[in-house]
Amino acid sequence: MGARASVLSGGKLDAWEKIRLRPGGKKKYRLKHLVWASRELERFALDPGLLETSEGCRKIIGQLQPSLQTGSEELKSLYNTIAVLYYVHQKVEVKDTKEALEKLEEEQNKGRQKTQQATAEKGVSQNYPIVQNLQGQMVHQSLSPRTLNAWVKVIEEKAFSPEVIPMFSALSEGATPQDLNTMLNTVGGHQAAMQMLKDTINEEAAEWDRLHPTQAGPIPPGQIREPRGSDIAGTTSTLQEQIQWMTGNPPVPVGEMYKRWIILGLNKIVRMYSPVGILDIRQGPKEPFRDYVDRFFKTLRAEQATQEVKGWMTDTLLVQNANPDCKTILKALGPGATLEEMMTACQGVGGPSHKARVLAEAMSQATNTAIMMQKSNFKGQRRIVKCFNCGKEGHIAKNCRAPRKKGCWKCGREGHQMKDCTERQAKFFRENLAFQQGEARKLHPEQARAVSPASRELQVRGGDNPISEAGAERRGTVPSLSFPQITLWQRPLVTIRVGGQLKEALLDTGADDTVLEDVNLPGKWKPKMIGGIGGFIKVKQYDSILIEICGHRAIGTVLVGPTPVNIIGRNMLTQIGCTLHFPISPIETVPVKLKPGMDGPKVKQWPLTEEKIKALTEICMEMEKEGKISKIGPENPYNTPVFAIKKKDSTKWRKLVDFRELNKRTQDFWEVQLGIPHPAGLKKKKSVTVLDVGDAYFSVPLDKDFRKYTASTIPSTNNETPGVRYQYNVLPQGWKGSPAIFQYSMTKILDPFRAKNPDIVIYQYMDDLYVGSDLEIGQHRTKIEELREHLLKWGLTTPDKKHQKEPPFLWMGYELHPDKWTVQPIQLPDKDSWTVNDIQKLVGKLNWASQIYPGIKVKQLCKLLRGAKALTDIVPLTTEAELELAENREILKEPVHGAYYDPSKDLIAEIQKQGQGQWTYQIYQEPFKNLKTGKYAKMRSAHTNDVKQLTEAVQKISLESIVIWGKTPKFRLPILKETWDTWWTEYWQATWIPEWEFVNTPPLVKLWYQLETEPIVGAETFYVDGASNRETKKGKAGYVTDRGRQKAVSLTETTNQKAELQAIQLALQDSGSEVNIVTDSQYALGIIQAQPDKSESELVNQIIEQLIKKEKVYLSWVPAHKGIGGNEQVDKLVSAGIRKVLFLDGIDKAQEEHEKYHNNWRAMASDFNIPAVVAKEIVASCDKCQLKGEAMHGQVDCSPGIWQLDCTHLEGKIILVAVHVASGYLEAEVIPAETGQETAYFLLKLAGRWPVKTIHTDNGTNFTSATVKAACWWAGIQQEFGIPYNPQSQGVVESMNKELKKIIGQIRDQAEHLKTAVQMAVFIHNFKRKGGIGGYSAGERTIDIIATDIQTRELQKQIIKIQNFRVYYRDSRDPVWKGPAKLLWKGEGAVVIQDNSEIKVVPRRKAKIIRDYGKQMAGDDCVAGRQDED
């Protein structure tokens, strides 16, 4: 007993004994209740000790609660007692049991909401989360190609506008640093932006390292290391480590951190790309409030301000800068209104019809008592309309200006709006409404409704002569009719009055007659038999009987007999104007605008033949009946031409509208889908169905405000009558917005179904749907029917004609089988003569087939299409093209199938060479089961070789794989590692390619010949030259050898360049297996040194053939006209009567300078005023400068303070090199040892000479040492290690190392010690070589960049200061002050201002300049003004 009583002690026991058992009752809780409770707990096998803490009580409550519904009275009492005890422990004051239970329920509801939110957040679409596999390990699911593709497209379309940030945030949900880097990689081309992003990432990483110093000593076993900044950025951490950090306990969310850093960087980029200030965002007089809010928040996101400031901006500026109409409403809402309330309240305000609505409202309130119905069948007064929202009379909810009432206007519950309400109301009569306000939904004639056969409504309309909706609108009779609207969710049963009796009857549009049961009618009757679904029944026929239906009267024949249900047939329904309506689905319209400053199209209709006019009239009448188009009057000034064509293989006509002009004027749309889905990316599914959406575009409504621009006119023959004019209510065929809006609507419609059935895969492309699942066929088909019903609810039909249930499925031009796919059968036409159009179609078919048929070639066929030819021109097939076509026919004879993708297996890509610059490839996961195949045949340059082409093919395949599967395959290439390495070392600027292995599939890729770097001893030397006369096109080519041989041939129709090549060809043809050739043509040398093995030029191909036959070839260059023996002789040989000799001063000086400094051609051309071609030839003739071609130049956009540092080795010594990235300026020094001490000393020297903000190094021990860190800290330099998303992050300094070594090689013999040679080389590089941006030398460029940076910074300060001012000014004769205008510049005597978009110069005496925040005018005569302006 004692133990049990000790549950509460002291103060708590006092509180316990003050609580009443019932509200207002006398009895209170006592100690005995606790003793009883602990005994009861034992009965329920619960520990009585739990009563001693609030946590224990909560556990007990959790156990008892599920049993409360079915439990005994004792159980409920126990639950109540413990609830009270729980609050006593919590020290929360409760008066009685009821209050404790209410509090408990409230607390539990809050908890539930939180968990729901949390699960909702968990349920957010995570594109590539870390998931748990069957073994319970956390594994990574890589980015989906759609995500990557969407991200690339966002950047392409939006550049770096503010929307990019939320898009990035959404797409990178749950991503690891590696995923984020992949995303950044795909947009790495935007180098300026990436540089800014890199800077931010490095700043944040350094800050992280500063706040989280590395822990001393080794890491205990079983524990993972703490991430460094570079680990978070994914540079120095592996994917496995990232997963461990993200899923550890406690977790380190490296992905989220890195994402935050990137978003910080993106903010800076957006700021740079979209520099609009939030103060400039004002709502236009007619701009919808929603659009204004969108612009406001788009700009707010880009503002660099704290969250508090942004909050203040939202609270004050949003209202302050709204237009007067909206401002009135927003101020009435008061300061605490949420954004949603604001948007709801301002709905419709600001639109063009707003003023009219306000007027109509005022008029209807003033006059509605006096309005009587004008129609013959309506007796009595018109009903007063009442608003669903505010309950006031005189307007409807659509026009209500009060804040929108929360919850549904139909059922009163919160969480949805009336249009989404699932409560199906059968009682729709105005007498007994389901709404408290007592007003059914009013259907305005202006709601021109388009038709789809999905959801039908009955409208009971008054009057014998129903007027057309458009007509009603024009004649201004909008307020005269008010119809009940009956939805068909349930049977349309209504109460009718017949013969003084009330009966319930079914409105049946399918019945011809009205049939009632058990009703006594006056007058005579005659017997009749009527047929129904259940057979024939005998009835009595009464004529001229009055029936009252929904307040409308009709007189007609009524049949009385034993009918299962009373039926009102069409004989009565037509009299009361009842119509069937097929409203277009409740799909939201997407607002569409014209391009700014443009008006709609006004293109005249061209004349049409009588049969076309007749066909169009019929089609339009049909479309109007279905509500797809509406008639319009002459007040619409727009027009688009319309015409008709016969449908393929049919006598039926088809209406075509030429929307080209409207398309030019319509805003641009974001292409929702970036490409078509590919079957190789489909995962294998047990059950598959393919559906097609019928009349796809016509099921989606067009924005009401845009419809007027789609106007067109059907003319009459011989202008007998004025043309009939129509406009579209739905998405028109041929209009540029239709595909994007349809795709967007379709996605929104499918989203709920996808969310409900996550295991069902739906690929949607326009109106084609592929649905796959792993369900049994029966269950799968049930799901398909669910999907079809779901689509039908929205008005989208899926016709049975195109509903494919059994394989093979025809989808998107493919044929899908359960375990394989292929392209739909391809028939190549047989023709005697081919036109350009025929060949284009043929090439298209073959390209389509090449996705799965390996070995398809189209190069020769494409050659036939070269040159500008008309589509109908006849093209004779060349022998090669005929052969190619025959080969393709053979390949297509045997059907080939592709496999489906299995995410658990690796992708492998294999490439084969087909010859003539064509390549074929297969991507597979298991041998002989290709996922897809393809071909590559691009010649990026006129002369190329196989290795170059192979790298290009690999890159094309990598990109294709990322798009389809989201990852790159492993490559199997027909090239030996040695050949690749030779190419790689020779051409150090060759591109990176992914992981690959050698596969021996002939023909192997090889470098067919190699040029010697030194002259061949003992081989004959040929001096070659060619010349041509520009006017006559005649020329000569020839050679002279060191052994006295010579030859010259005459050429016609040639050029200098061709003649030079011809001379080389002669020399190769007439020489032995080893030869030295000396040319004076830089052009010829350039081509041959790139070692091409194929060319578009026949002559180069002949030279290649000769080169391959030779054992050794040495090719050298000498400058022309320099008195070089053999060269001079051959020059005379070929110049006779051909070449005009050109003598230039300055060549000698340039050559001398070059021998000393080996400066590049740009420096010589500029310093000695010689033509570029001569300067290039001097460089090329120098054997020391002829080691390699010039580097291919990329574009690195870099800020002025960045330097890259690296150590390189030469002659066993260490050279420390520093490059100023923006200019290429070099500092280098031989250091005694690769230590931190030496590096730090070098760094301080560098910082003492130049403004160094950031250094970029690799992870060498000397750079990562504490000494260097200390030096960086002292000098205020930020240190970076590699760019996270760029494998060649040290590219600039790496290429400079090579450049430096090259220069040292050229001047090494001029210096005894290496350290002297290094400094000489640095001098040459910095001051004797010109080129790049501005044609400066690196030294000049550095100084220019730094000076410009200082000027820009100062100017920026001035501009920022100046932009804070506003100017009020007076024009020449107008005494009124205008303004405020923006101050652009302030000079001594005048200011430059911008008013609206006009820029003006105003004298100082006529301008008053004020700061933006003040209302005080500050002119020249005001002290405050003068202080402000400075």
Swiss-Prot record:
Residues 1196-1346 form the Integrase catalytic domain. This is Gag-Pol polyprotein. Residues 1016-1139 form the RNase H type-1 domain. One of its GO terms (cellular component) is viral nucleocapsid. Residues 484-488, 532-538, 571-583 are annotated as: Dimerization of protease. Integrase catalyzes viral DNA integration into the host chromosome, by performing a series of DNA cutting and joining reactions. This enzyme activity takes place after virion entry into a cell and reverse transcription of the RNA genome in dsDNA. The first step in the integration process is 3' processing. This step requires a complex comprising the viral genome, matrix protein, Vpr and integrase. This complex is called the pre-integration complex (PIC). The integrase protein removes 2 nucleotides from each 3' end of the viral DNA, leaving recessed CA OH's at the 3' ends. A lipid is attached at G2 (N-myristoyl glycine). Mg(2+) 2 binds at D1025, E1060, D1080, D1131. Residues 12-19 are annotated as: Interaction with host AP3D1. GO terms for molecular function: aspartic-type endopeptidase activity; DNA binding; DNA-directed DNA polymerase activity; exoribonuclease H activity; lipid binding; RNA stem-loop binding; RNA-directed DNA polymerase activity; RNA-DNA hybrid ribonuclease activity. CDD domains: HIV_retropepsin_like, RT_Rtv. A motif (Nuclear export signal) lies at residues 16-22. The lineage of its organism: Viruses, Riboviria, Pararnavirae, Artverviricota, Revtraviricetes. A motif (Tryptophan repeat motif) lies at residues 980-996. Residues 451-474 are annotated as: Disordered. Its EC number is 3.4.23.16, 2.7.7.49, 2.7.7.7, 3.1.26.13. Residues 273-359 are annotated as: Dimerization/Multimerization of capsid protein p24. It catalyses: Specific for a P1 residue that is hydrophobic, and P1' variable, but often Pro; Endohydrolysis of RNA in RNA/DNA hybrids. Three different cleavage modes: 1. sequence-specific internal cleavage of RNA. Human immunodeficiency virus type 1 and Moloney murine leukemia virus enzymes prefer to cleave the RNA strand one nucleotide away from the RNA-DNA junction. 2. RNA 5'-end directed cleavage 13-19 nucleotides from the RNA end. 3. DNA 3'-end directed cleavage 15-20 nucleotides away from the primer terminus; 3'-end directed exonucleolytic cleavage of viral RNA-DNA hybrid; DNA(n) + a 2'-deoxyribonucleoside 5'-triphosphate = DNA(n+1) + diphosphate. A zinc finger (Integrase-type) spans 1145-1186. Keywords: Activation of host caspases by virus, AIDS, Aspartyl protease, Capsid protein, DNA integration, DNA recombination, DNA-binding, DNA-directed DNA polymerase, Endonuclease, Eukaryotic host gene expression shutoff by virus, Eukaryotic host translation shutoff by virus, Host cell membrane, Host cytoplasm, Host endosome, Host gene expression shutoff by virus, Host membrane, Host nucleus, Host-virus interaction, Hydrolase, Lipid-binding, Lipoprotein, Magnesium, Membrane, Metal-binding, Modulation of host cell apoptosis by virus, Multifunctional enzyme, Myristate, Nuclease, Nucleotidyltransferase, Phosphoprotein, Protease, Repeat, RNA-binding, RNA-directed DNA polymerase, Transferase, Viral genome integration, Viral nucleoprotein, Viral penetration into host nucleus, Viral release from host cell, Virion, Virion maturation, Virus entry into host cell, Zinc, Zinc-finger. Mg(2+) 1 binds at D692, D767, D768. Residues 8-43 are annotated as: Interaction with host CALM1. Protease: The viral protease is inhibited by many synthetic protease inhibitors (PIs), such as amprenavir, atazanavir, indinavir, loprinavir, nelfinavir, ritonavir and saquinavir. Use of protease inhibitors in tritherapy regimens permit more ambitious therapeutic strategies. Reverse transcriptase/ribonuclease H: RT can be inhibited either by nucleoside RT inhibitors (NRTIs) or by non nucleoside RT inhibitors (NNRTIs). Residues 185-223 are annotated as: Interaction with human PPIA/CYPA and NUP153. Its cofactor is Mg(2+).
